[in-house]
Amino acid sequence: MKAPLSWLRDHVAIPADTTVDQLKDVFVRAGIEVEAVQEGAEVTGPVVVGKVLYRNPEEQKNGKTINWCVVDVGSHNPEEAPKDIPEGMHGRGIICGAHNFDVGDHVVVALPGAVLPGDFAISSRKTYGHVSDGMICSQVELGLPDDGTDGIIVLGDDAP
């Protein structure tokens, strides 16, 4: 059974300074076998919560449909709105291949300068005819365990 540390903390009082090795020792002393400990992958740089303001599915020549999105990332929005986003919207233009989200959803966004597991550096780049200024992330892209959800992380409406 895999049990994320965050889940354990939701159900058991674990002091904040407890290391994974100390926790493993507690389990073993209690007679609970620990086969392996999987450390999370490191993510560096700006990763923030954004709100999807606009989502336009665009079919490509290769048959793939991508989403041209505008995502409000608060204080991380560019000072000037990109030229190819709808008038009156202020946020970052981002290309996303996932389809499990919609306008109004809160999502996890890696901004240019972030480095995701596998040394995947996020930068502004032109792709599919737009400048994508970040990446809307899935659990796997952030190095989190795959929970079987196909697509990006959609947070609750109360996400900060």
Model regions and ranges:
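Phosphate-backbone binding interfaces of nucleic-acid-interacting proteins
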Residues: 1-160
